[in-house]
Amino acid sequence: MAESNFVDYVKIYCRSGKGGRGSSHFRREKYIPKGGPDGGDGGRGGHVYLRGNRNYWTLLHLKYERHIMATNGESGSAKRSSGKDGEDRVIEVPCGTVVYDAETGEFICDVTEDGQQVMLLKGGRGGLGNFNFKTATNQAPRYSQPGEPALERTVILQLKLLADVGLVGFPNAGKSTLLSVVSAAKPKIANYPFTTLEPNLGIVSYRDNRSFVMADIPGIIEGASEGKGLGLRFLRHIERNSLLLFMVPAEADDIKKEYEILHNELVKYNPELLDKRRVLAITKSDMLDEELIEALSQDLPEGIPYVFISSITGLGIVELKDLLWKELNKENFHEAERIVHKNIDVSTLEFEDDDEYIFPVDEDEDDPDEEYEEYWDDDEDEDTRK
């Protein structure tokens, strides 16, 4: 079976660069026997950033890049020359990426906009050269500071798709067929449950060159919030959708009951989904006459807009687009929506075994027994660097 290209979570090890060592050097020139200290400062270690990129839709490009490290700052040198700063590392991620600590599952940050840049790890500051420690009583200081150590962290990047409309329904409810009709997306379509095994995105064209994004996720079954079926892994993608389109086939024994089951599964997974606007589409309605449609309308859930559609014949598709656009653009609909990301249980995620990796040791690695803090415990040092 071919490996899926849809990767919505990865685990990576990140390390910033350590600061370069300050130089302990004295000016030595002919006819200047006491030139004094002229050791330069060490360079700053490289930072590690996350940056949103709308050209990425999955985390596939990071699946096999498990170690991301910025470079170290270079040491200072004579003539008060500062060392070169370490090179930053920027991790490009799709918009909607959420970052968690791989050990505790604690939420760290999220990236939702194209070009948004978030610092994940800060590079170490460069150490001060001995020139900075020259005083009236100490004209020839022989000590300098080592650079600050690097920071390291293993994180989990988890993608939650950003879409205007999310399709919610049982397997074989016609979600993929609808997406293929209203957009240029070509999801796999077949007459059996769980045809869709991964989310699909499509851009729906509307009047006057306007458009909105629609997301199709694998079908939800009763008990999905408890881990049954495929729904649990993909339910998180619904959290980012502005509007939920519930899809129930007209052939269902009880349309209202099926809608309530779907609704309850979402609420069990995340009660905050109750606040999202909802629209109901009764699919596969091409065999219904007006009298039967009128009868079924009497038993539908109250307080939710609905429309009868058929993706095969095109019945109600225009009306559905109008309804979705209307709901998406209602007054106050796009007020700032604050999404609270809960911590995750990292034990529920499966990762391939990490390959053993030996990190390179720098030739100028500091003595491990050297106490770093003793050089940075004075606020005066910080003031000297400004």
Swiss-Prot record:
SUPFAM superfamilies associated with the record: Obg GTP-binding protein N-terminal domain, P-loop containing nucleoside triphosphate hydrolases
Recorded GO MF terms: GTP binding; GTPase activity; magnesium ion binding
Chief location category: cytoplasm
EC number: 3.6.5.-
Compartment(s) where it occurs, according to its Swiss-Prot or TrEMBL record: Cytoplasm
Residues noted as binding Mg(2+) in the record, renumbered to the chain: 176, 196
Record domain Obg: where: 4-162
Co-factor(s): Mg(2+)
Keyword GTP-binding in annotation: yes
Short name of any one Pfam family annotated for the protein: GTP1_OBG
Binding residues for GTP: 169-176, 194-198, 216-219, 283-286, 310-312
Keyword vocabulary terms for this entry: Cytoplasm, GTP-binding, Hydrolase, Magnesium, Metal-binding, Nucleotide-binding
Gene Ontology cellular component list: cytoplasm
Region (Disordered): 18-44, 357-386
InterPro entries reported in the protein's UniProt record: G_OBG (IPR031167), GTP-bd (IPR006073), GTP-bd_Obg/CgtA (IPR014100), GTP1-OBG_CS (IPR006074), GTP1_OBG_dom (IPR006169), GTP1_OBG_dom_sf (IPR036726), OBG_GTPase (IPR045086), P-loop_NTPase (IPR027417)
Domain OBG-type G: 163-329
Enzyme class: hydrolase
BP-aspect Gene Ontology terms: ribosome biogenesis
Task performed by this protein: An essential GTPase which binds GTP, GDP and possibly (p)ppGpp with moderate affinity, with high nucleotide exchange rates and a fairly low GTP hydrolysis rate. Plays a role in control of the cell cycle, stress response, ribosome biogenesis and in those bacteria that undergo differentiation, in morphogenesis control.
HAMAP family tied to this protein: GTPase_Obg
Family per record: Belongs to the TRAFAC class OBG-HflX-like GTPase superfamily. OBG GTPase family.
The protein's assembly and partners: Monomer.
Alphabetical list of PANTHER family matching this protein: DEVELOPMENTALLY REGULATED GTP-BINDING PROTEIN-RELATED, MITOCHONDRIAL RIBOSOME-ASSOCIATED GTPASE 2
The protein's name in its UniProt record: GTPase Obg
Organism: Parabacteroides distasonis (strain ATCC 8503 / DSM 20701 / CIP 104284 / JCM 5825 / NCTC 11152)
Gene encoding the protein: obg
